């Protein structure tokens, strides 16, 4: 009888430990899923993204924009391929116009690029990159690096590679 009690106690302890482990790992997985989900239309916070310590690509567009729709599968692929190495976000400005208020967006789609330290990405060869550099009106410091229009996968990969992502 004592042996049966010992076995029951050990089984109970084991089940509790396994349950705690599953609970903790599930919440970590949910945090990572939220952090790396592509659509940031309603929860876009660039400062929070910058604090993650990963390079960032933000694409401002709209579900009703044809070039944006054409880029959607590419952004999904990039988001999946670079998960944990870079953050790729899409913000639908027709659903959340406030998300774009601090960015110089003139047309959609427009992409913005940030280094892992949160600073605007600066390509080695600005003239050949087809990227636009924006400076702050207050102090003339480099504030944004952007691209207007569509980019293809090789363009994104080249930029990410130059940002130090393999």
Q: What residue spans do the PLM features occupy?
A:
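C-type cytochrome heme c attachment motif
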Residues: 63-70, 110
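Non-catalytic, surface beta->alpha helical segment in thiol-disulfide oxidoreductase systems
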Residues: 113-166
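Short active-site neighborhood of thiol/selenol oxidoreductases, capturing the structured segment around
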Residues: 51-63
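Solvent-exposed loop/turn segments at secondary-structure junctions
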Residues: 62-66, 93-98, 118-120, 150-153
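Thiol-based oxidoreductase modules, predominantly thioredoxin-like and allied folds used
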Residues: 60, 79, 83-98, 105-108
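A short beta-strand-turn-helix
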Residues: 35-54
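Typically the conserved alpha-helix immediately C-terminal to a functionally engaged Cys/Sec
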Residues: 68-82
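N-terminal targeting signals for export/organelle localization
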Residues: 1-36
């Amino acid at each position: 009888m004592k042996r049966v009690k010992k076995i029951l106690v050990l089984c109970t302890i084991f089940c509790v430990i396994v349950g705690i482990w599953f609970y903790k790992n599930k919440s970590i997985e949910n945090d990572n899923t939220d952090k790396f989900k592509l659509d940031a239309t309603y929860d876009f916070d660039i400062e929070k993204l910058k604090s993650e310590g990963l390079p960032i690509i933000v694409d401002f567009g709209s579900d009703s924009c044809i070039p944006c729709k054409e880029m959607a599968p590419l952004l999904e692929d990039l988001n999946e391929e670079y998960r944990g190495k870079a953050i790729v976000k899409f913000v639908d400005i027709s659903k959340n116009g406030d998300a774009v208020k601090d960015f110089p967006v003139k047309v959609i789609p427009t992409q913005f690029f940030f280094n892992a330290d949160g600073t605007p990405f600066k390509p080695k060869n600005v003239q050949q990159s087809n990227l636009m550099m924006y400076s702050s009106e207050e102090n003339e410091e480099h504030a944004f690096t952007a691209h207007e229009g569509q980019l293809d996968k090789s363009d994104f990969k080249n930029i990410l590679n130059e940002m130090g992502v393999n």
